[in-house]
């Protein structure tokens, strides 16, 4: 698989990333059986063997079990640890943490950032995280406090680079003003059924500041690939059907699957979007890599955009 630089760093990552949110098959740690953990390890190995060199996780994915699965994979596969880059995230706290009446919330306090990083390093069984994200915007974020936490992690050798996830441009600009080094990534939801980043300045900022945009849920939870949620009683049935029909037409022109075309559509943008593949199916993981060799024409790209909008361009 081809590679690209992560932001303005010298670090190179694969053009598609592997995300392990679903790797253990549950969000409840008590349900992670040895069989599920083994299946998760096999999924990571399948991605590595298919050419993925950037692996994405988060502290909240099954309360750290997904990070543990990646860590176990690194132990099993000789040379993998040095051949890949590892990203994980902090900042989301679910309801009940730490007290029964504690609400679901976001926490960018220095205390939580530092604690979460140490916990992730333990789960992953590594010494340094290549890319450490703030997961979702904390409206109480104090940039100087975050900067101090980042500096402490950097100085301790625990984190190589920092990024953000689900941040609008204004949040990125505000935080960046207080940091000693540039943010290198912004991971947001991007796919033909969610066009906001194309219009709200997110991708423009990525180009301007040389920030790598990574797309989580690039297939809209899978339905852009399978069409499984295309039901006649859905309020956007006609729009979705037109979109899938258009994608199918382009896929037919290439002799490729709908999934590959959707990924190639994202990768066409000059901001160099990196789609994050979250399948546990080795065949699907391998199939997605075909998008790296597809260069849609401008006409094909715009046909999909117009169908995604559900109305003609002005």
Task: Kindly label every feature range from the protein language model.
Residues 82-95, 189-190:
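A short, structured active-site edge motif that brings together acidic residues
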Residues 8, 74-81, 121-125, 154, ...:
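Acidic (Asp/Glu)-rich catalytic clusters
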Residues 94-107, 228-232:
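Surface-exposed, active-site-proximal loop segments in enzymatic domains
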Residues 18, 57, 88, 131-134, ...:
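Conserved beta-strand positions
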Residues 1-85, 155:
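N-terminal binding-site loop/beta-alpha segment at the start of enzyme catalytic domains
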Residues 137-314:
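Beta/alpha (TIM)-barrel catalytic core signal, keyed to glycine-rich beta->alpha loops juxtaposed to Asp/Glu
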Residues 32-47, 108-124, 170-173:
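Short, acidic/polar
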Residues 121-140:
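Active-site groove signature of glycoside hydrolases
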């Amino acid at each position: 698989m081809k590679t690209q630089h992560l932001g303005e760093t010298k670090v190179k990552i694969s053009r598609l990333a592997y995300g392990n949110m679903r790797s253990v098959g549950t969000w409840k740690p008590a349900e992670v059986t040895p069989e599920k953990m083994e299946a998760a390890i096999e999924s990571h190995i399948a991605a590595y063997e298919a050419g993925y060199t950037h692996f994405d996780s988060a502290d909240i994915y099954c309360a750290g079990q997904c990070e543990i699965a990646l860590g176990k994979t690194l132990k099993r596969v000789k040379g993998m640890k040095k051949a890949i880059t590892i990203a994980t995230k902090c900042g989301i706290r679910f309801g009940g943490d730490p007290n029964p009446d504690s609400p679901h919330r976001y926490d960018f306090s220095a205390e939580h950032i530092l604690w979460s990083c140490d916990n992730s390093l333990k789960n992953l069984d590594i010494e340094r995280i290549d890319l450490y994200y703030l997961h979702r915007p904390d409206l109480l974020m104090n940039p100087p406090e975050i900067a101090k936490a980042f500096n402490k992690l950097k100085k301790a050798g625990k984190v190589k680079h920092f990024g953000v996830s689900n941040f609008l441009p204004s949040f990125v600009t505000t935080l960046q003003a207080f940091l000693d080094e540039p943010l290198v990534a912004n991971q947001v939801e991007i796919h033909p059924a969610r066009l906001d980043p194309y219009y709200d300045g997110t991708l423009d900022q990525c180009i301007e500041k040389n920030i790598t945009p990574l797309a989580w849920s690039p297939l809209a939870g899978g339905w852009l690939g399978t069409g499984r949620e295309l039901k006649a009683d859905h309020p956007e049935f006609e729009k979705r059907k037109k979109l899938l029909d258009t994608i199918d037409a382009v896929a037919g022109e290439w002799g490729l699957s709908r999934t590959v075309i959707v990924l190639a559509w994202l990768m066409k943008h000059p901001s160099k979007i990196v789609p994050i593949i979250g399948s546990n199916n080795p065949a699907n993981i391998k199939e997605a890599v075909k998008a790296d060799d597809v260069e849609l024409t401008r006409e094909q790209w715009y046909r999909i955009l117009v169908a995604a909008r559900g109305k003609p361009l002005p």
